[in-house]
Amino acid sequence: FPGCMIVNRQGARFMNDGANYDETGRAMANAATTPDEPSFYIFDEHYRRNYLAGPMLAMPRLFDGTLPGDVKRIVIKAESLAELAGKLGVDPAGLEAGVARYNSFAQTGVDADFHRGEESYERHYSDPNHTPNSTLGKIGKAPFYGIAVYPGDSGTKGGLATNADAQVLDAAGAAIAGLYAAGNTAASM
């Protein structure tokens, strides 16, 4: 949805954060310098009130005082981007610069870094009423929020091993002619 981004500890986007979960998980795993290093899902009050925000539903009447304690521990809240960065262990100047760059893309509707919104999958998880790009929206209304996110599986998802052309691979790693797997039938990581 428009108005959120995923950054690293330097506060910079490093992938198309609107991509499908397989691509996102791989990008997060590849960007991590240690196996347990999180990425950070960043959004603002406008996003929180209008779209799904991790464990919080988009509920205008849901006040912070009514959030369960475990959600308050997961969702970090701050009155400024610099304060949020400090609470998350992210470089404050990097986060402010990253959000400014993302906001410039939201204004023009063109993600010059990662092309968010150019694929139909990304536009499916967007706001069709938001323009000029239904997947890019400004992050600017305090308070700001951050959630540490980690790559992982979605379900058991053993899945079939495939090559770059979605051909299923046999035990020796050779493509099986005419057999393809995609989505949840293919191994994601």
Place the predicted regions along the sequence by residue:
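Mobile, glycine/GP-rich and aromatic-enriched active-site lid/loop segments adjacent to catalytic centers
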Residues: 1-189
